[in-house]
């Protein structure tokens, strides 16, 4: 996993030059948004269980066959596995958002996810939809447009770029599942 600082050093080193120009501008932007990034990750992690359970409840309401006998989340064991998987995905998205780099998400979460779900018989359409619901919930929390007020102080300012970055990580998960 490379964070923004490591990426800048590797980029400069590969070209045999000092860190400068574009790398410094990128790092400056990353640092300037640091508190917003921390607030965004805090908002996601503080509300993780609600985000995941709402996503799973959402797919169950949209597709009642999931909770019917032989459905994707029919037994308690399958429901628990679905909730666990949602929390794992959300955790790795928050890691990527904190680092400003998707490699931890790619390496430790997405690599082989589609094949694993296929082998386990997980309905990929429903799993993708659950991730899309988590994406919407996380985006609302990051941009402070959720209906429930946050119970923590937040840095003021526009967080749409960080919300967009988080959305791109969720999109990577959806693409990996589909």
UniProtKB/Swiss-Prot annotation:
It is a peripheral membrane protein. GO terms for biological process: photosynthesis. InterPro entries: Globin-like_sf, Phycobilisome_asu/bsu, Phycobilisome_asu/bsu_sf. Keywords: Antenna complex, Bile pigment, Chromophore, Electron transport, Membrane, Photosynthesis, Phycobilisome, Thylakoid, Transport. It is found in: Cellular thylakoid membrane. (2R,3E)-phycoerythrobilin 1 binds at residue 82. The keyword Electron transport applies. Phycourobilin binds at residues 50, 61. (2R,3E)-phycoerythrobilin 2 binds at residue 159. GO terms for cellular component: phycobilisome; plasma membrane-derived thylakoid membrane. Contains two covalently linked phycoerythrobilin chromophores and one covalently linked phycourobilin chromophore. The keyword Phosphoprotein does not apply. PANTHER family: C-PHYCOCYANIN BETA SUBUNIT (PTHR34011:SF7), PHYCOBILISOME 32.1 KDA LINKER POLYPEPTIDE, PHYCOCYANIN-ASSOCIATED, ROD 2-RELATED (PTHR34011). Belongs to the phycobiliprotein family. Light-harvesting photosynthetic bile pigment-protein from the phycobiliprotein complex. Heterodimer of an alpha and a beta chain. This is C-phycoerythrin class 2 subunit beta. It comes from Synechococcus sp. (strain WH8103). The lineage of its organism: Bacteria, Bacillati, Cyanobacteriota, Cyanophyceae, Synechococcales. The gene is mpeB.
């Amino acid at each position: 996993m490379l964070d923004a600082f490591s990426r800048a050093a590797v980029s400069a080193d590969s070209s045999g030059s000092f860190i400068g120009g574009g790398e410094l501008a990128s790092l400056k932007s990353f640092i300037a948004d640091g508190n917003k990034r921390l607030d965004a990750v805090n908002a996601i992690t503080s509300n993780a269980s609600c985000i995941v359970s709402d996503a799973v409840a959402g797919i169950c309401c949209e597709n009642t066959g999931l909770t019917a006998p032989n459905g994707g989340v029919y037994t308690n064991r399958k429901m628990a596995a679905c909730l666990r998987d949602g929390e794992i995905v959300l955790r790795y998205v928050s890691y990527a958002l904190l680092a400003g780099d998707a490699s931890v998400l790619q390496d430790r979460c997405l690599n082989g996810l589609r094949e694993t779900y296929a082998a386990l018989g997980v309905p990929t359409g429903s799993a993708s939809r659950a991730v899309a619901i988590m994406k919407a919930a996380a985006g609302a929390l990051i941009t402070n447009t959720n209906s429930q007020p946050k119970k923590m102080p937040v840095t003021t300012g526009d967080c749409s770029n960080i919300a967009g970055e988080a959305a791109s990580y969720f999109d990577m998960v959806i693409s990996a599942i589909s």
